[in-house]
């Protein structure tokens, strides 16, 4: 078969094991991990879905090696418990039966153990251990590990690696990056020891070397050992890329695959988990430089979801393997689609952090663009309907398109009506923001799915009660979306005012001095985008905080980007009048201020089109509202 991306689709052999292509599934934690560290059935299904989707390897995350000194959150595995080993075996089986290589990530959190515990066990009260005596930024004291404790942990890595092999895992990943224990020993910022484990680079690498030696002794030769580390810690006081190269050279004889990530979780979540504000493949330069200096295969990771970019990475020799995490939540079948030359059908990750925020908030996984995530046990196959019906969809936004596609796959006769000349609803506006192009492109993907499934799409067609009566559907799905909130502020009808939903149609009207009214998610992201273009942007928000509607993972990175791109933020300001000079506002003390700008963006929120819903609610035998 001739592949569209021949280098990405080419096999690679690592430690005697041949992988069918270069697309691997990175560690992503499960959600139903039990108190004794077992992988629950939902998590096993979560990993299995990536194997069904065609990933060459699927890594199960994160297995503790030494519970006495570790346990950073409620989703750690513990294979030393008999039931946990059985559950790990089931997970490995679930992965391997689809042709993927099951891998297990071994991790120790070190001084950050206990940070995210939710009273899963007594570990929330345990002492924090690290390379050196110190105090964490949150005030928690950390004690230096003794040599005896280090020996225990080293041996524990070997023991758990042996158990993983027994359970059916065919590859081991040692997590040596992102600020966890091995990284803490490697880092001059964390490691202040004066014995053989601290000081020189050779000494700081000693713990990692001993861990890798113990793992190799346990699993034997011709068993792939992967070392995941940060090519650079990306903060002052940590090691840089130059030292990252030397670390890689020190460790390469003990490993079979070097997995190059970046940053430390505690010092920069947006480095370890790149946000939409960063370039796709932002870590590739680290892997590319390190690859020049080692003789083993190198993997890269970091916001990768475009097969054309991944093909270039492999073809140019920047890396040998590409890892994806969130991209395989958005579309678990991405690797299979690439191998089948169907890359146009890939649903791309938005990097919105819904997946990670939901786990923090509710202990579940969810994905903005993939409703199957968190429901993997229900199966990904759409079952044919017992009774075929005539279905009418009112609204051609993402919700309406997805509903139409699903109904058509079930065998129904589906007509989708869109009152405008183009599909997409509110997503049409996202084309104005370069870092949200994936969201705009989602419309094209869903439209293709719907048309290929046989959906009839009618443009310039508004669904009214009379229209429903004429069409006489068996079922009506109302996906009317929302409309922008435009309050009657004096001057709102001025030529210099642009509603944020219409920004994409008015980019040529935007001057160099802009006032954005509204500090919600849409207003903040608009302000950031205009700031990136070099415009002088001021942000006005009536509340005392920006973007309270943003999720807990996205919001801190959003605010950091606001600091970089926006000239001034005015919270507690109520906009009262728009003039050619800017926006007159009143602060909490009743004082008036002019926020200067020659273009004003109105981003004051959206309101659901409940009027449409009420008109159509009882017009068909079966009605559902999205």
Predicted segments with their positions:
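Flavin-dependent oxidoreductase catalytic cores
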Residues: 1-394, 398, 402-409, 510
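Short acidic loop-to-helix transition motifs that present clustered carboxylates
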Residues: 305-308, 329, 462-465, 503-506, ...
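Short loop/edge segments at beta-strand edges and connector loops
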Residues: 443, 459-461, 499-501, 571-573, ...
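Rossmann-like dinucleotide/flavin-binding elements
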Residues: 385-418, 423, 458-472, 479-496, ...
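A short helix-to-beta-strand connector/capping loop
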Residues: 318, 450-457, 493-496, 562-568, ...
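Rossmann-like dinucleotide-binding cores of NAD(P)H-dependent redox enzymes
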Residues: 413-453, 504, 529-575
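Short phosphate-binding/catalytic loops that engage adenosine nucleotides
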Residues: 55, 100, 169, 295, ...
């Amino acid at each position: 078969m001739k592949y569209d991306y021949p280098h990405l689709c080419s096999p690679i052999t690592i430690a005697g094991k041949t992988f069918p292509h270069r697309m691997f599934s990175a560690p992503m934690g499960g959600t139903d991990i039990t108190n004794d560290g077992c992988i629950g059935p939902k998590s096993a299904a979560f990993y299995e879905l990536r194997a069904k989707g065609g990933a060459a390897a699927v890594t199960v995350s994160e297995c503790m090696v030494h519970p006495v000194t570790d346990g950073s959150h409620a989703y750690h595995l513990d294979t030393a418990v008999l039931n946990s080993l059985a559950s790990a075996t089931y997970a490995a089986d679930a992965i391997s039966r689809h042709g993927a290589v099951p891998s297990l990530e071994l991790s120790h959190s070190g001084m950050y153990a206990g940070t995210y515990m939710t009273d899963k066990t007594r570990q929330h009260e345990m002492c924090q251990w690290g390379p050196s005596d110190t105090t964490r930024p949150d005030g928690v004291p950390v004690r230096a590990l003794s040599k005896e404790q280090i020996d225990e942990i080293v041996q524990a890595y070997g023991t758990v690696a042996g158990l993983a092999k027994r359970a059916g895992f065919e590859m081991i990943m040692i997590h040596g990056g992102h600020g966890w224990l091995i990284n803490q020993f490697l880092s001059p910022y964390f490691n202040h020891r004066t014995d053989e484990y601290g000081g020189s680079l050779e000494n700081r690498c000693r713990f990692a070397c001993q861990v890798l030696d113990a793992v190799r002794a346990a699993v034997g030769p011709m068993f792939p050992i992967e070392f995941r580390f940060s090519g650079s810690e990306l903060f002052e006081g940590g090691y840089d890329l130059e030292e990252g190269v030397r670390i890689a050279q020190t460790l390469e004889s003990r490993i079979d695959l070097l997995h190059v990530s970046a940053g430390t979780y505690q010092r920069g979540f947006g480095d370890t988990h790149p946000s939409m504000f960063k370039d796709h493949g932002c870590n590739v330069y680290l892997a590319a430089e390190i690859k020049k200096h080692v003789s083993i295969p190198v993997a890269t990771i970091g916001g990768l979801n475009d097969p054309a970019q991944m093909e270039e990475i492999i073809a140019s020799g920047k890396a040998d393997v590409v890892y994806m995490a969130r991209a395989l939540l958005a579309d678990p079948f991405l690797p299979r689609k690439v191998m089948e030359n169907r890359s146009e059908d890939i649903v791309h990750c938005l990097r919105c952090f819904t997946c990670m925020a939901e786990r923090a908030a509710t202990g579940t996984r969810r994905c903005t663009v993939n409703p199957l995530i968190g429901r993997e046990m229900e199966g990904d196959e759409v079952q044919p309907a017992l009774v075929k019906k005539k279905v009418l969809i009112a609204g051609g936004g993402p919700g309406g398109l997805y509903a139409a596609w699903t109904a058509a796959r079930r065998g129904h006769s589906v007509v989708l009506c869109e009152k405008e000349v183009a599909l997409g609803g509110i997503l049409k506006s996202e084309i104005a923001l370069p870092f949200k192009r994936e969201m705009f492109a989602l419309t094209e993907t869903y439209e293709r799915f719907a048309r290929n499934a046989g959906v009839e799409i009618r443009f310039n067609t508004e669904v009214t009660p009379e229209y429903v009566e004429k069409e006489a559907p068996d079922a009506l799905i109302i996906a009317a979306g929302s409309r922008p909130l435009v309050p009657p502020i004096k001057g709102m009808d001025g030529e210099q005012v642009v509603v944020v939903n219409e920004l994409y149609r008015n980019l040529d009207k935007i001057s160099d001095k802009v006032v954005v009214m509204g500090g919600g998610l849409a207003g903040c992201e608009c302000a950031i985008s205009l700031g990136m273009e070099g415009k002088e942007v001021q942000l006005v928000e009536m509340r005392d905080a920006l973007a309270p509607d943003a999720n807990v993972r996205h919001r801190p990175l959003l605010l950091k980007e606001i600091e970089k791109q926006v000239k001034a933020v005015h919270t507690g300001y109520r906009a009262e009048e728009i003039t050619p000079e800017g926006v007159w506002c009143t602060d909490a003390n009743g004082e008036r201020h002019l926020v200067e700008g020659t273009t004003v963006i109105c981003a004051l929120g959206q309101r659901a089109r409940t009027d449409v819903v009420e008109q159509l609610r009882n017009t068909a035998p079966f009605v559902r509202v999205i």
